[in-house]
């Protein structure tokens, strides 16, 4: 019922979106108001268009007077638009990628601030963007997307590897030495192999950083060293890191099952998930919650085909952080007081779209 009501509300709220999107797209939007309104916006989607997008169509990280624009936001937004089958807005973001984020070496700058692009990338964002471009090329028959995906992939192999492993970043001088496990994206590695950029051995070597990682007291390692070939475990785990890595595990994976069981037990016991836990006692180390934690839990458990009632309960808790009153200025936003972060809106948006696409929610 909630989603039917929201769809009705957004039909009227989105009447003004065509003007907002035209401004947000810096006059590059070609959709008519009818086309824009044909698919009702999710509340968080409405919030992003009206509160986080600047007049050029770039997503701000927060409400700072000197906003930054992250490749993380770009990649998550592109992934969402792809999942929604929104080709026109995906094209707009592709234009921002090539105009603003893609560096001369064909890696993606991780941050733009005060008009200056950092010379450093972030592996997970490059991988996500490359994967989205490859999938969009197949979906919409766009050879330019496919070529840009190949260009990014080739540069990742050239610059972002150490001792045969893709590592966290390249800072214009050298690749880093460590691999954060949540940065390992097997689907993106498969694209690199498909495009002839890496061979099967390299694909498997890098995927095995995640697949072969041993659990310690039920938790995944934080990093893997490309130098020592050893894993490092945190004494206090960040649940976002754990869930991101777990989301990338194969369906039915044994480690994924262990983590899924703990997530379900923790949520059923406390009715919530906290941001950080002791790796030894498994007790909460903080008292804060995060919409992103719930979003990743939804994405992870959905991929593992867990019980839909548990997934919906976690989704409902995530939605407790969203502003539902359409007369509020920040309607649709996942807010902490008067503050927000793009990450905490984009991941819930992506998780909600996944549940729509899987018919878990209506």
From Swiss-Prot:
Main localization category: membrane
InterPro entries: 6-hairpin_glycosidase_sf, 6hp_glycosidase-like_sf
Gene3D superfamilies: 1.50.10.10
Keyword Cell membrane: yes
Keyword entries, A-Z: Cell membrane, Lipoprotein, Membrane, Palmitate, Signal
Lipidation (S-diacylglycerol cysteine): 21
Listed SUPFAM superfamilies: Six-hairpin glycosidases
Record has Transcription regulation as a keyword: no
Domain of life the protein comes from: Bacteria
Lipid sites, type N-palmitoyl cysteine: 21
GO biological process, one term: carbohydrate metabolic process
Localization: Cell membrane
GO cellular component, one term: plasma membrane
Membrane topology (UniProt): Lipid-anchor
Signal sequence extent: 1-20
Protein name from the UniProt record: Putative lipoprotein YdaJ
Species classification: Bacteria, Bacillati, Bacillota, Bacilli, Bacillales
């Amino acid at each position: 019922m909630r989603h039917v009501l929201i769809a009705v509300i957004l039909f009227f709220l989105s009447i003004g979106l065509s003007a907002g999107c035209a401004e947000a797209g810096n006059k590059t939007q070609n959709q008519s108001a009818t086309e824009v309104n044909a698919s009702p916006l999710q509340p968080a989607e409405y919030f992003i268009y009206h509160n986080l997008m600047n007049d050029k169509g770039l997503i701000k990280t927060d409400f700072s007077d000197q906003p930054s624009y992250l490749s993380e936001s770009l990649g998550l937004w592109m992934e969402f638009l792809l999942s929604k089958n929104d080709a026109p807005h995906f094209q707009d973001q592709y234009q921002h990628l090539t105009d603003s984020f893609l560096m001369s070496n064909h890696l993606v700058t991780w941050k733009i601030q005060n008009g200056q692009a950092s010379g450093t990338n972030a592996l997970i964002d490059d991988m996500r963007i490359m994967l989205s471009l490859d999938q969009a090329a197949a979906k919409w028959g766009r050879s330019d997307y496919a070529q840009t995906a190949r260009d990014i992939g080739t540069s990742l192999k050239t610059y972002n590897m150490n001792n045969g492993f893709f590592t966290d970043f390249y800072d214009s001088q050298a690749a880093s030495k460590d691999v954060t496990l949540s940065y390992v994206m097997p689907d993106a590695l498969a694209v690199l192999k498909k495009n002839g950029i890496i061979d099967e051995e390299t694909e498997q070597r890098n995927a095995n950083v995640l697949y072969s990682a041993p659990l310690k007291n039920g938790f995944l390692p934080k990093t893997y060293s490309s130098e020592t070939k050893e894993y490092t475990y945190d004494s206090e785990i960040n649940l976002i890191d754990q869930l991101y890595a777990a989301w990338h595990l194969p369906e039915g994976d044994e480690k994924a099952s262990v983590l899924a069981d703990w997530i379900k037990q923790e949520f059923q016991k406390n009715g919530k998930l906290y941001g950080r836990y002791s790796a030894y006692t498994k007790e909460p180390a903080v008292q804060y919650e995060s919409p992103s934690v719930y979003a990743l839990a939804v994405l992870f458990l959905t991929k593992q085909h867990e019980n839909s009632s548990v997934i919906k309960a976690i989704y409902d808790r995530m939605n407790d952080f969203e502003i539902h009153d359409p007369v509020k200025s920040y309607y649709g936003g996942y807010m902490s007081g008067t503050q927000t972060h793009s990450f905490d809106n984009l991941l819930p948006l992506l998780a909600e779209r996944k549940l729509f696409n899987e018919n878990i929610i209506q």
